[in-house]
Amino acid sequence: MYDGRWNLDALYTGFDSDKFKSDMARLDEVNALLGAEAKRLVGRSPRENLMATVPLLEEHKLLSCALSDYCLFRQTTDSSDGAAASANGRVNMLSGAAARAMSEITRYIASISIEELDEAMAGEPGLTQYRNYFRREKQRTQHLLTGDGEDVAAKYDVSGGKTWEKLQAYETSGVTEELKGKSLSLTELRNLAYDPDGSVRKAAYEAELKCYDKIKGPVAFALNSIKLQSISECELRGFDSVLDKSLFMADMKRDTLDALWGAVEEYLPVFHSYYKAKGEALGYKNGLPWHEIFAPMGSSNRTFNIEQAREYIVNVLSIFDGELADTASRAFAEDWIDVYPRKGKVGGAYCMPAFGTGEFRILTNFGGLFGDVVTLAHELGHGFHEMQIKNNGALNRNYSMPVAETASNFNENLLVSYAIDHAESDDEKLMLIENRLQNAALVVCDIYSRFLFEKEVCERRSDSFMLPDELCDIMLASQKRAYGDGLDQSTLNPYMWVCKVHYYSTDLAFYNYPYTFGGLLARGLYEKYLKEGADFLPKYKAMLRETPMLSVEDSAGICGIDVSGRDFWRGSLEALKKDIEMFKKLVKQG
């Protein structure tokens, strides 16, 4: 009988398997070969060097990813898997052993002019496919530290930024507050924001604020320290600002970000009207209180077993495209999905490629509700993206954060739109539309407030240390600008900077705008599909395939979209405006 567990045999049958052992041994050999080739760069032609090093870089990528993915798959389904933890440590050490040699090769590639690169690659498909990869490597090298700077920075980061990250995680995971006689963690309290009982939601929010007040001091030190480290590192690397570095890593122009936020600001009043309408429907007159943002509305008695979920998803996706539906069918049929929650398995959901197999794996915690079906469809969208790029060269499979959620959000739009159109009652339709708008309003209003907060913090941190009260003031100002009169401003959450892990990374600053970009890009693509029909499909697949090789602007251009102007974003927001109008109509009827 199917127990809902994935099959990993296409990767490895175990850590003691011959294949796992041979791949570990081969990775060690590749490390040595890369080291040897790095010493031979001087005195050979660019063509000779590329022909010698690129295949090794490809093999290193394939081996290290396959080995580490298998460890991840094992660890995330069984936290007590000691063999997986041990193997993961060995894999990480082996994967990083060639870092210096790979850095030298990257610097060498960066030293070659574009003209010399073109001449060296001529007639070699195995090299010409990486023209854009080499371009990006040349750009990245301009921001590398000289001498032993990279090694020194990495070592200091362990006791610097990485330790401050751990402090924030430690404080937020350990703090508790009593609610109705029970000591609850911050995560447990935040999850009660979805409780059907309004009094529970309010009490949980008040307890949540008390948690933040207990830990705000050390977490403020963590935030200040991480941001100062990011600012200092950006100065050393030649970036104008922390945001400048973030956009560089995303392969995205500042004009595109400005166009996105410009369109969002135009439509903020529309989203404020959604919050006010929800507040009025729940009996509030001065806007929606913060603790009611996730208050459920409408209802549905519909539940799904995993076979019904499979049938529903495949049916909806087949309306759009046979290949997309077939990919989903195969994932179910060949046990690529670990379905149910169990002891030792992590929460949430993710999709990862199974490198070297042409497959992917999905972890989810399916509970039978429609939201769980949507989560499955979302992750299958990631899987479809992976299937589109699986034939790319090994070095052409990493895409940037802004486009990472495109296919997954597109799948969500397909599924939720179908569900709304086929709702069995107005109450079910209200639930579906309100859930969609909850997510959309977070992508627009909440993410914008996070962006404004981080931008202000980075600007102030250059010459001042911000105590908790100042950080709270910045957060409140950001929320007032983003949420306007849609929320009851006396109930705003000044401590949102404490709990959001996205602020606490020296590697990924401004881990916010990609959510807005991805969400609105997917909705805009869905609207384009509704207009173009079957003609849209080849462009959509080509766009997904090219995301690792092109900038976000050029990727979107394949579908005839200009993301550097406001018009496209206005179209996405206009579609959401129609959803808001439908929501208002339904709550008035109710």
Task: Please report, for each region that a protein language model flagged, where it lies by residue.
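Post-HExxH zinc-binding segment in Zn-dependent metallohydrolases
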Residues: 400-428, 436-438, 442, 518
